[in-house]
Amino acid sequence: MNTYAKYNQSEQDYLESIFLLLKEKSIVHRIDVAKKMSVSQAAVNKAMKNLSEKGYIYEDGKHLYLTETGKKYAEEVYEKHCIIRDFLQKIGVSPAKAEDDACHMEHLVSHETVLAMKQFLKR
């Protein structure tokens, strides 16, 4: 969990969404991403073009897949999200609020802070 800081929030959100969709089902389409993120098809098309050019995703027909680099990055983002969510729940935040806050905080909290949260959760 070390590289997420150099990517922008939009990339993180799209890759995390694709990662989670792929965990749910083996075939993911652009429309699935649009629905999950509550964004337009045009926004997804633009993001997929950008992510493809950067080597994070590829498409086989109409199906989306993460490259090894994209998968590693998405896993790091998701791990950060889970650590923050779990930390917030541990200190008494409701599960729904912890999930919502983690979505926002994952883009702002430093690597050092996430590591400290992770260590705290191990106690």
Specify the residue positions occupied by each region the protein language model found.
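N-terminal helix-turn-helix DNA-binding core of bacterial DNA-binding proteins
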Residues: 2-39
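Basic amphipathic alpha-helical segments that dock to polyanions
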Residues: 14, 33, 44-52
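Short, solvent-exposed amphipathic helices
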Residues: 76-91, 97, 101-104
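Residues within the alpha-helical elements of helix-turn-helix
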Residues: 36, 73, 90
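Key DNA-contact positions within bacterial/archaeal DNA-binding proteins
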Residues: 42, 96
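A short, conserved structural fragment
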Residues: 52-61
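Basic, amphipathic "hinge/linker" alpha-helix immediately C-terminal to the N-terminal HTH DNA-binding motif
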Residues: 62-80
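C-terminal regulatory/oligomerization modules of transcriptional regulators
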Residues: 100-123
